Structure formats: structure tokens, C-alpha cells
Amino acid sequence: MSLPRCPRTRTVMFSRTLTRCYPQRTLWIAILCVICSWTLSTAGATTIRDKEVKPDAPQDLTAIPVKAEAIVLTWKKPLKGQTDGYIVVYCLKRNKGNGCERQKIEGGNVTEVEVTNLYANHTYQFQVQSWYSDHPKGASTGYIEASGTPPIPPTLRRNFKGLVEKSLGFEHKIPCPVKADPRPYTRWLKNGTDLTPNDPDDNVSFTKTSIVFKRLRFSDAGLYTCVASNFFGQPIHVNFTLIVVDTHSESYAESSVLESFSSLELETGPYNETEEEETHFPRFTDTERMEPEKPLPSNTKVRLECGARGTPTPNITWIKDGVQKWKINVIRPTRVEEKGFVLIIRRAIVRDTGKYTCIVSNQYGTIEHTYDVKIRERLPVKPIMSPMKNVTATVGSNTSFVCRVVNDLTPHFAWMRFNGTNNTKQRLTDIDDHISILQQRWVEEPMLTCDEFLDVFYQNQSKRMLECLHLIQLETQGGMEEANQLKLYNVQYEDEGPYLCVAGNFYGMSWEGAYLDVVEPTTQAPVRTNPPAVYIPNNMQPTSKTQLIIFSVVGFVVVLILVTCIAILCKQTQVRHRRPSDKPDISGPKHLYRQTSVDSTQSIAPLFGGRNRLTSSLTVISEYDIPLDPEWEFPRDRLTVGKTIGEGAFGKVVIGEAVGIVCQEKTSTVAVKMLKANAMDREFSDLISELAMMKMIGKNPNIINLLGCCTQEGPPYVIVEFAHHGNLRDFLRSRRPPEEYEKSILLTTSQTLTNKDLMSMAYQVARGMDFLASKKCIHRDLAARNVLVTEDFEMKICDFGLARDIHYIDFYRKTTDGRLPVKWMAPEALFDRMFTTQSDVWSFGILLWEIMTLGGTPYPSVPVEQMFDYLRSGKRLEKPQNTSLEIYHILCECWRTSPGQRPTFCELVEDLDRIISVSSNQDYLDLEAVGDAPVKTFQESERMAFMGFRAPLSPQVYYKVPQTRDCCPYAN
């Protein structure tokens, strides 16, 4: 067997060859060999031990609770009557270390033991082992779990109320209204946000099942959620609203009666009158009853409540549809009455439909609430209900009942269930006889609560057949369930029975019932209920010599297969490295982006880079084996390098002459990228990465194109097109007019630029960027300094990746990831380090501004340290002089704060093309007015709120931006 690029070896030399060629895999092979050797040695040792007689393991271990602190363990198959054997019983408290002592029982005929002195209502793990005195190992059963009393999953207390009112300034302890065994773990949330013991607020603390307020404040009011869970059943969420009231205040606004916890014990402390009292701004006292929508039939009573408190007593004003004096237009105004914080409209008609807003205010503030009252003429028909379906659920699962009304009335729902389980199926047929007495009361007041409903039903009898189901516990991830849906969590056997849905309106009431049948799970779940406990299979060592031999052989075969697979994988990897594809395989919407070197100050990192950057030691250049690419490899003897045209800390760009790189036997002037002698591994990998990406990108007239490379038998060279006029920034600055004292002694030879020339430059850059965007490449450093101008005045986007000046600080800000071109970067790139094609559009706007100012410096008076605050406040660069409003409109669109609102490069190409088509070659610039923005730019920009600004179009706009655009064509 031979491996790629390794000397041919015999089988005995396989491991040496694999170690020399693939050192990173040697450790894994060594581990596999150790496992194989251990398996074989174990088989041999077991052959000797197998001759000894082992005890039989106890079978059918069960646990029976006899009281809260004691459990009886029973098993079968003792030690065959031998007197020299013994039994060991192990007992562990679940998840809490040792819970009971280990018991050693002499004699082999024992099949039962009572474990005492346990903690009540706690779960334990038990295991029984049998031993011979002359044998080194015993035989054991698996672990089982049991407790003295059956565990209870989290369940909501029956007497729970969802509204809690507490006094200001006192200490209060509010427990989670959940019963469970073992004691549940509780987590608290306020207004949907987690409250943790590590919060800086020392006024709030937590016990195992309660939240404690040292001194209750108004800011502590809100919606609290208690999440309780233990090892059994599903977690339960309980919501309640905490209202803080000032019992020392003489002013106490009239409101609805508040409910509270009647069964919870509260701990209070003295009120410290020396501390400053909090402001008593108005607040609503019963938000749960303030439902925003009130759909009612005509000829009914409308009751709108806005119960509130405050000091001083707040005033309340009612308005309808924004009109304060709405009562003068009411038919028979005596029907409308205000009682404190309640608005009552008797015998409502359709004209009473509207939005009623209560405005509650005092000197500290104003609050308001709006009711949407809809009065409709409807048929006088009580609710017509669809039959409910019976439900079968397994223990511990969730289920629900749905109550549907088919007519067009909006009824009031109430859910109930029967107490007890005796003959409950027959009670569904007898409910009509009992429920008819409620008809008259329901017609008078259809919005009865469920408790009020049963008070009338049983007329204060102590023994009740029905009980209410409060919907406060019916919470889901999406919010509260609808009133016509009853959802039951963590179903238990005691939940089995009939359930009733009662729906009523002003014309009567109807009901439907269904039966919940609770069954055992079809698949045995982990032990979490009362014993008999579930037996866990015994995890004993194999006692058969045949089994050990089989396991050893199987292990050896597995190791052999793994070694063979690794060898095949190594061979395939080497073949792929020897014959790489001409272009990288890019599938899916993968984005390529430009990388910025750590020490970069100029735009010197590779133009295009993959997402993961190579890192290695920064001492010397590693000897990389670069695969030969015949399509791009250029002979070194046909390349002559000349003077340096760009230089940085670790690399440089030189001018060169290549024979036959463009046409056969024709010498072409090229630019050659190379490394300096002090370059490190990172710079080497950057250069190779840029080379690979340029191969994949392809050619375009407005991109510095790759011509070839030299990667074999010497340092790597990247050969690209040469630009005669250098970068665009210096080219523009060279076209600026001379200073006054120079005009008399110098003769200007620079060609005069027109508006059309400048638009052509921007157009070509936009086409190049549109090409990159189509290839899913992100430049990240688009600026005039990174655009080259050829001898034919073509614009070519580039980046001489290894030419850098580490002392230059104007363009970049030092971060942990390197220096960044701060003044060219979009806000999302600065603040969130998010680089996309739309962030390149922002940079294009800065580049267009540079073009219109003939190489001006953006934000000349804004320090780099203030750029973050400058952009965050919405300020932008001002319009360059002699720039038309349509051009500045493009700038403003590129500088939109939201990336999604910026134009695409395809749209920019079309817009600039339209401007060029209507421009005149005679549109000369006033060269006296171009250059860097004046010093006052920053101060004037402070007064310009640019956020959301859209520059007005001049009357001479020559084009209209279409709503949709097709992709722009490219030259390959």
C-alpha cells in the first residue's frame, strides 16, 4: 500500500509512514491501538478469572412505601442458601449525596429489608448487591428510585387569585402559589424579564419558593410570573399582578373591589416614616377588568370602569371619539351617568357605538384608557353552541377543551368542573335541572364571574358539586388563551371527569360538557410517581468467556476498519491537493469579503478573502506547498521586476515587464505584488488567499485583473494590471488649480476636468462594484485611494494588499481587530461591525464626494474619536460646491441610516448613466471652489439634522428612478 507523496513502504512500515506524512493524525491512531491492546489483554485476564464461581445477582428488585420515612425493598434469587455470603443495600438521596446508611446483611437467604430514617417526601435511589466472601466482586441489581410518599408535580393552588394589593413601605413576602413534592425550583419574572438573585437591586431577595420585598415601592408594581418545576411533570407558569397602595394617604380613589391572596401568609415590618415618600402619580387599580373591546347587543347596559388612585385624588374626564362635549348629542342624555370612575350607559343603542376614553390626571401626571364600544342590533337569541368532544389524555401530558358558539353573538364564557368522581358521567345529563334557576339572573347581569355564578347556583350552600376553573393559569408562549379554550397542563388522574363550558348573553345561557379520560402512558416513562418503582436493567459485567472473546474480536475489527478509513481519507486529501480545481467551488449564497490586517493603516489587506483567516506563528514564514495551477502560473525567467511603486511594513508592489503574459512574445508592463524578507505567516496566507479569490472572481474592465502568478521555486509573486496614472485620489488632486503664487511661475499642463468626466469616473466605479456585488464579494475599503487610473483613463478598483503605512492614522481607528477606515465606513459597520454590500454603497457615497471635491478629505474638521457620535446623531457631509442637487440626492440616498433604504449598485449604475447621457462636455467645473471641505463644515453640520433627510430635487432633474430595476449586464 502506498500513500500520496510518501515513500513506498511495506506493511510493517505503515505506522512510520503515516506518522511522518500525517503527524496530526498520529495521536488518534495511537489511541486506537491502545484500545485494541487493552481489549485483547482484558479477554486473556478474564479467561483466568472466569474459572472462579461468581454469585448470582438479585432479581426483580421492588420498593414499597410503608410510611413517609420508610420503604421496604424486596428481591428474588438470594445466594442459594449459602451461609458465607452476604447482601449489601445501597441507598442514595437523589442528587443530594448520601441520604441513608449502607446496610450489610449477613446470610444469603434474605429477600427483604426495611430502610428507615428517610426524609419524608424525598426521592431515593436503591441498589442491592450479593457477595461471596472468597470472591473479589459482587453481583448487583440496577438502581431504582422510590420515595416514602408519591411525588407531586407542580400544581396551581385551588384558591389562587390573580390580583395582589400590598401596602407601600412595608416588608412583604409573596410565595409562589404552587404545590409540589419535591419542593419545586422557582424562577421569577417581572413584566416578562427574568429576576435573578444577582440583580443589583438589594430591595428584592428570593427564598426557595418566595419573592421578598424589604420595603415595597411604587416601582415594584407590575405583572409577576412564577415558573415552578421539579423532576416530575411539566413546569407551570403562574401570573399575578402586584398593586402597591399607600395606606397612610387619606385620599383613596373609588374603584372595583380588589382580589388578593386569602390563603398566603405574609410577613410585614414597620413602616419607616423618616424616609422620603414617593410621588403618588395616578395609576389604574384593576387593569384586568379594563378590556379594550366592548361588543354588546342593543338595549343593554354598558359599564366602563377606570378605577384609579393617586395623591392628590385624580380627576377623571370622559371623551367620545376625541370630542369632550359629546353628551349633548346623546339621545336621552339621562341614560348616561358617571359614578366616580365608572361610566354607565343604560339601554344602549347603535348610535352609542364609539371609542370612549377616560383621562385620569392630577398634578403629578396623566393616564388614559380607551374602550372600543360596539353596539349592534342583533336577534334576541341565546348562544347556540356546538357539541364538545370528549378527550383522552395520558398522565403528565397537556390537553385542552374548545367551546364554540355558532351564532353571531359575543357571549361571556365560564368554565367549570365537577368535584369528586362518583357517577360524574351521569351528572352531565342532570345539569339542565340545576342550571335553569340561573336564567333570570344571567339576563339581568350577563358578565357574572364564575364564582358569582356558583354563588347564585348553590345559594351559599357549603357543599358544591361544581368548582370554577380560573383562566389565569392558562398561559402559553403566545400569551393568554382565548376565553373559549380551556387548556390543562400536566394532567393527573385526579383531573379525570366532566368539564362544563357555560356561555351566556342578555337573552339567555347555554352549556355544553365533555369528559376527560386519563390513561397511563403507552411507553413507560422514567420513574416519577409512587412505587412500585420502575426496574432499571442490570449493568453487570459479562460472565461468559464466549462473550468476552466475541467483544474482543469485534473491537479489533472496529479498530482495523477505522485505521483503513483514515488511510483512505489521507489518500483522497492528498489527491485533491495535488490536482486542485481551476476555480474554488462556491455553492449557495456564500458571501466573500475583504479582510483587514491587524496592523493595517492604509488599505493594504487582500482585496478578497474567505471568512476564516489563517493564523500561525508570527516569527518566520512557513514553507507552504502551493499547488501548481497551469492556467495562471507564469515562468519566472520571462518576468523582469523593476522599481518599487508601493511599499509597506511587510510587502511591496513593484513595476515589472512580462514577456508573453498578454500576447505571445510581446512585452507588457505589469504590477507585481511580493513579500518582504520580514513578512510573517499571516501575510503569506493573505497573499495566497487574495490570489485564489482573484482567480475565482474573473475579469472585468473596472477591476484590476489578475494576469498571472509565480508560486513555484521561489517567493510568491502576484502579477496584475499596471495603472499608469496611479490612484484616483492623487489623480484628482493633480488636476486642482495651483495656488496664487504658483500661477505666475508654473504652466498648468493638467487636462481640465468637466462634470461629465467626474460622472464617468463615478459610473465606472459603480459598474465595478456592481460586478463584485454580483459575485457576492464585499470590498470593505472602497475609497478613491483604492481606485487606479489607467493610461486610457479607465477606473479600476484595486487594493495593493501588502503596501501599508503603519504610522498613518487618518483613515483608520485602532481596534482589537485592526485599524479601520472610519471615515468611509457605514454606521452599522462602525457600531455593530456588520459589513454588507449596502455598507459598500455608503463607502461609494464617500468616494463620490471625493470625486466631486477633486480628492477632498471627508470630515476634515471632525476628529476620528468623534465620528461615532457624529454619525449616530444623524449628521452627514454637506453638498460640495458646484455639485447639482441630483448628484447630492444620490449622495444622500447612499448615506441612509437604514441599509435597506440605500440604493443598490445596479441602481447607481443606471442613475449615473442617465446623468452622463444628458450632460454636456462644456459643463466645466469652477476649479477655484473644489478641494477639501471648509473648516466650518463640522460646525455647520451640527445644525443639520440629517436623520431621514431627503434632498429636494431641482426643477432640472433629468431622470426618474424607476420603482423596479433589472440587473445590470457585465463584461466578462
Swiss-Prot record:
One of its GO terms (molecular function) is fibroblast growth factor binding. Residues 1-43 form the signal peptide. Residues 150-242, 282-374, 383-517 form the Ig-like C2-type domain. GO terms for biological process: fibroblast growth factor receptor signaling pathway; positive regulation of cell population proliferation; positive regulation of MAPK cascade. One of its GO terms (cellular component) is receptor complex. It is found in: Membrane. Keywords: ATP-binding, Disulfide bond, Glycoprotein, Immunoglobulin domain, Kinase, Membrane, Nucleotide-binding, Phosphoprotein, Receptor, Repeat, Signal, Transferase, Transmembrane, Transmembrane helix, Tyrosine-protein kinase. The modification Phosphotyrosine is found at residue 812. It comes from the Eukaryota. This is Fibroblast growth factor receptor. InterPro entries: FN3_dom, FN3_sf, Ig-like_dom, Ig-like_dom_sf, Ig-like_fold, Ig_I-set, Ig_sub, Ig_sub2. Residues 57-152 form the Fibronectin type-III domain. ATP binds at residues 645-653, 673.
